[in-house]
Amino acid sequence: MAHVFLLGHRPRRNPSDRPANTYTTVTITKPEFVFGFQGQSKYSYCPSALKQADGTVHLYFCGNPENLIMVDNIFHIKINPDGTQTAAKSVLQPGVSGSWDDHHTCDPSVIEGSFTWKNTTYKYAMFFLSNMYGVYYNEIGVAFSNDLDADSWVKYPQQIVKKTWSSEGDQEIGGGGKSWGVGQPSVVSLDGKGKLLLTYTVGDIGGTRIVWAEADFSNMDTYSVSTPQTIVQTGLKAIDNQSRDYTCNSEFAIDKDADKIVMIRPVQPMPSDYPNYLNSSLEIDYMNLSDFTNQRGNWTPIYRITPDDTGYPRNHNATLLRDNFGHLQDWEEPEFYFTVSKATPDVQPSGSSHAEWTYHIWKSKVVKSK
């Protein structure tokens, strides 16, 4: 059974703050299955969802093309307004051996704009995480297309965000551990062209966090990314709803007219049983966009998605349903896509029993009522 948040009345402070209804009940619609490689030893997770004016949704996600082999590709399906889907196809793969991205290619975030490279102007950019064989850390790349239905995307050859340390190879963090690097990008258009709000996860000797930067990819010969800043984390609560939480692996979307930014994030810590690398719950939070970019203010929860809502013990790697520019149609009642997984004793880390083979994509929507 879904749990609810009760939001009390708050006074209007400025035109960007909509007055909340007294004792508004917030819940979510019954989650619906969207996609999974069912009956196969394959996973589908980390979605990026773009809603078109006619109701069509372009869904990009991470998957493995071969049974039992955990090598990430980025796949695409188109979900028609009547609910029918196109066949899943791999549209971005690891690079050639020896390249910076020759191992995994995952975590897509797709945006519309105007991006010029080698005298060609592209309409869409796909930001992604990748890494190479022989190292543990991740970095961020970008690829381009003029068609959301494209069978393949044109990769920019180098990383656009590199690891945070200058030395070659992995960064040791003690206890035999290694730094995760940078990845899990989320991009929002600021001008409908090449200027973007870029957020991504950092995992290094300084800890785990999400940072944001303003980027300009209008011309890839002279692209720029500002010095990243750690996002505001005030107001975020851990699984106990009391302890302060930290952020990683989150998706963002904005409503510029309302001056709001919305985030869907994992709630820490992760459970201790297998798979102990996936979160059980997700949360949707919001704050003023102007506060976010000025490093002030605090997050307010909209809804926390738990196993009671979904029927699955793990709920992770989520996205908000956005338009092509990363904007929300209704920031107060967003639709979202998320990944589920089974847990022990239903799965175990071996062969065809891995938890990964139960990664499927579902969707739901926040609903408010008086």
Which residues are covered by each model-predicted region?
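N-terminal Sec signal peptide cleavage junction
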Residues: 1-12
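Conserved beta-strand position repeated once per blade in WD40 beta-propeller domains
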Residues: 46-48, 107-109, 184-186, 249-251, ...
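Beta-rich carbohydrate-recognition and catalytic domains
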Residues: 11-46, 50-103, 113-178, 189-244, ...
